Amino acid sequence: MPIIAVISKNNCQFDDLENYVLPLLYQYHDETTRLQLKNKLNDYLWEIIEPYVTFINCQSDIFMETICTHLVKEFPDKKLDDFFYHTESSFSFPKKHTELMYCQPTWSYQKDQEVNMNFIGCLFSLKHNVIENTCIVIANNYDISTQNNIVIGDVTKNDILRMVRRRYFFSAELIKNDTITKYYYQNPGYLVSKVFDLKEQDTIEKLTVGFLKYNLSFYCNQNKNQYVNKIATRINGLYQLYGDVLVLNEMDEHVYTNLSTHELRRLNVLAYGRLYDRQLKADEIHEESHVEVDEQGKEIEKKKTPLWSKYIIIDKRMSEWQNNKNKCFYCNKNIEKPVVCNKCFRIKYCSEKCQSEYNSYHSDDCINPKSITN
């Protein structure tokens, strides 16, 4: 039975949040220290929000009825038909995406009264809608074996905490040699200056590349006297990058979202191959219909690609990669000792002979020669 989270109306305020968030930001932590700091933050958040969060097991055959019944519990004298019901996408994660459900009375009702506010629900509304009374969080797990690629899943305590945290800071990844390290931040510019120890007059190189619905921003000094960053070069696919490289996921101009170590590692292995293969196939483009109301009050149906669709693309490609990860790009035989292109680091061969025979085809797809050390 799927588990939903029922969020009662509340006036939750996180007055001491800075004391728990600031120690996490803009600096390197080993995994043990980072988990300790996150657990302290989680304990603080949960102590405040726990009285308003209830997890409910829903029978599949009365799933929507159960949801609607809990949404209208503040109005025991009203019927289910006395409300408009709204569903909007909320935060998405590598294994699931969440939706927020709430209702709106159809009768004359005074909105925006503080006594009816659901402040946790307001945090979860990415459309910045004002959420009143009870709201509900639903989880959708990605499942590429199903027709729609998603199935109703369980909402957990960890999901709720992650959703709250997402409102206050993001994660980026630093690629240093062959390791990937997580950094937390609120201000991306300040993170870049801290990681690279920039002074006021210093500059930094930025390269933005789209890859499988991610919009990755690579920051580096691009000093060719430093080592070639193989992982960053492989993932961006276009230029050799040098030294330590900081990677952020910039959804839109100055709009950032999380980039986890797990996600970047998966992008790293999926970066092997031709640049042409990065293009999305027709069956990989997932669109959902939604209704908008124009200035004349007319409803218009539009199609939109949801942000979480990139996780389904990645899951499908990882499944394909598992079957081909040890194959020579040229002859398709199993690789015992890989020979990797030492410029783009994207193409693997089983022998130098295969590399030589494919070289004339690969040269146009390889790295930009202007970025290579002389």
From Swiss-Prot:
It comes from the Viruses. Keywords: DNA-binding, Metal-binding, Zinc, Zinc-finger. A zinc finger (MYND-type) spans 328-366. Zn(2+) 2 binds at residues 341, 344, 362, 366. Zn(2+) 1 binds at residues 328, 331, 350, 354. One of its GO terms (molecular function) is zinc ion binding. This is Putative zinc finger MYND domain-containing protein R331. It comes from Acanthamoeba polyphaga mimivirus.
